[in-house]
Amino acid sequence: MSIATEIIGVPETLDHFQSDSYSPYHFFSSEQWAKFRADTPLTLTSDEVKRLRSMGDPIDLDEVRRIYLSLSRLLSAHVESSQMLFEQRNRFLSLSDVTKTPFVIGIAGSVAVGKSTTARVLKELLGRWPSSPKVDLVTTDGFLHPNAVLQREKLMQRKGFPESYDTAAILRFLSAIKAGQPDVKAPSYSHLVYDVLPDEYKIVDRPDILIFEGINVLQSRDLPAGGKIVPMVSDFFDFSIYIDAAEDLIHNWYVARFMRLRETAFRDPNSYFHRYASISDAEALEIAGDLWANINLKNLRQNILPTRPRADLILKKGKDHLIEQVALRKL
């Protein structure tokens, strides 16, 4: 099924380029998207790409050339336009000595779909622009409520769902970033112990660009009673990206990652999931399937996938974990 069919519900037999007029998006195959690279230089090496990719993600230099150089060029245009608007507004308001606040890029998508790889690759590419911008990357993992809180509130089985995050803390963090405040603290998270690390933080000090990555960053929220204005996380984004793939593919990637982790991280005695290292393959497959069906699939359908149409750019992956289609919101 084409990405256009999924987003706008046109008949599957309708070619996704013909459906362009029915949608707020332009649709491109990966081959067409690659042509927008123009003369954007490749500034990463093969070894660097291997270091940046997540477990099970086969991204290589060819994928960077096909997809990420064009995306880097697009984002460069958006950042430059934002800077021009900033300068024009300052002239309009007769302001001087005002520092441009960070350009914030949000990246959303399911678990195991490759958000972290995309975020890390973009961080490196954007930081190597000729202008040498300062680029920081923060994930929403650190904004999860600590396990002790989730256990007390009986939310451990809903970890990753919107209610498991300290949304107020996320909004405070992004507000401080957009206000241009120095040395803003982002809480740290350990995937080894599967918990927020108390009193450990990443310091974000007025970057030119901030990449903010997490499964629910495009999540909307119900309007509160009484008309009180409550911002959404995405209100702070200058550009947003959704990493997409078919449910069955994400399921396969999730299970495959779980099985690989049994042979690596889970073997660490300090791992929260160490108990899974010694079970049989059959038991591990059953547990991974249950975790997917009862937690991650539900979250995808209820909370993550419905946010896809809110993204400025959608990158759709195929069965080989490589991007096959691109949808870019029209201006």
Swiss-Prot record:
Binding sites annotated in the UniProt record for ATP: 109-116
GO CC, any one term: cytoplasm
TM region(s), chain numbering: none
Principal location: cytoplasm
Pathway as given in its UniProt record: Cofactor biosynthesis; coenzyme A biosynthesis; CoA from (R)-pantothenate: step 1/5
PANTHER family to which the protein is assigned, alphabetical: URIDINE KINASE
Protein name (database record): Pantothenate kinase
Organism, as annotated: Rhizobium leguminosarum bv. trifolii (strain WSM2304)
